[in-house]
């Protein structure tokens, strides 16, 4: 039973944290609340420190393409089976404590009602509120383990949420490919365009420049907490500029509306807090939304 519900591994607790005055926080409930408050405020706090830009992001948005994605096509029974069986069983359960392995084993029994719910969601532009709850697990990175900033949040989403997201991902991604919207030199989070491909392309350009006895100059930027600071309103504007409109755009808008998250440490849960910006690390749609969000960066930098 433990293997089936993903609870066969020994839980490892984070180190005791320290508060603002340097005193240790040992209560798992207080540690969970400390983490949740920190993770929830990362994006808004960083966004408040960003200096106003001299130009609006709208100045760099390309004209709306002639083709548009105004609605999502329905998911078929075959597609649902392919999507669901494609998930790995090792995925930890989300807030509903239902691991994907259970969904896969019972898919033949729940396929019809699940298919109806997914297609109703896609056609109405509404994402179920029960699937907007994220369970956050703090993962230690490095340095001082008693400081919350040295942990990164991993979002454990409901298994059904991931199925919804995978259906929407495939439709948005195919539309972007068909309309050739994505910048061709964009690497990361794309099939056939990994960071390894970026290194190969970069080394090739450097080698060619050296062979031609040209001077080389490079600018490398680190986008601090990039996923956490993503502005939902800006993303939605860029999605519309890409041609994603109608109920498809409504669905994405509702996907971000009233999302909440909590941190769990052992059996202790923090208070649930609302997520007001950013995309979830651990979600399927998050990386794709981030790609669209920074799509016009080359146009901005070239000017």
Name every feature range the model reports, one short phrase each:
Residues 105-112, 116, 120, 162, ...:
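Short, residue-level hotspots on alpha-helical faces of the histone-fold
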Residues 2-150, 163, 269:
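Surface-exposed loop/turn segments and immediately adjacent short secondary-structure elements
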């Amino acid at each position: 039973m433990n293997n089936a519900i993903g609870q066969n591994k020994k839980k490892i607790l984070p180190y005791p944290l320290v508060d603002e005055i340097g005193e240790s926080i040992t209560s798992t409930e207080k540690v969970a609340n400390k983490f949740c408050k920190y993770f929830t405020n990362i994006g808004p706090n960083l966004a408040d420190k960003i200096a106003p830009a001299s130009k609006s992001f709208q100045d760099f948005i390309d004209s709306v393409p002639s083709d548009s994605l105004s609605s999502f096509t329905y998911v078929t029974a075959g597609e649902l089976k392919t999507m669901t069986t494609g998930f790995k069983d090792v995925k930890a359960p989300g807030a509903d404590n239902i691991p994907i392995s259970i969904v896969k084993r019972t898919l033949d029994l729940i396929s019809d009602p699940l298919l109806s719910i997914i297609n109703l969601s896609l056609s109405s532009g509404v994402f179920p509120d029960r699937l907007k709850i994220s369970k956050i697990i703090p993962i230690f990175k490095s340095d001082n383990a008693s400081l919350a900033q040295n942990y990164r949040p991993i979002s454990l989403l409901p298994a059904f949420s991931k199925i919804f997201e995978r259906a929407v991902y495939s439709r948005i991604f195919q539309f972007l490919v068909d309309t050739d919207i994505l910048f061709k030199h964009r690497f990361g989070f794309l099939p056939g365009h990994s960071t390894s491909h970026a290194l190969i392309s970069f080394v090739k350009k450097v080698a060619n420049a050296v062979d031609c006895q040209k001077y080389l100059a490079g600018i490398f930027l680190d986008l601090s907490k990039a996923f956490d600071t993503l502005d939902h309103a800006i993303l939605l504007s860029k999605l519309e500029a890409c041609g994603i409109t109608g109920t498809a755009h409504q669905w994405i808008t509702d996907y971000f509306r009233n999302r909440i998250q909590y941190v769990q440490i052992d059996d202790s849960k923090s208070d649930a807090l609302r997520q007001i910006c950013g995309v979830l690390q651990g979600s399927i749609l998050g990386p794709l939304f981030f790609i669209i969000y920074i799509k016009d960066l080359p146009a901005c930098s070239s000017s």
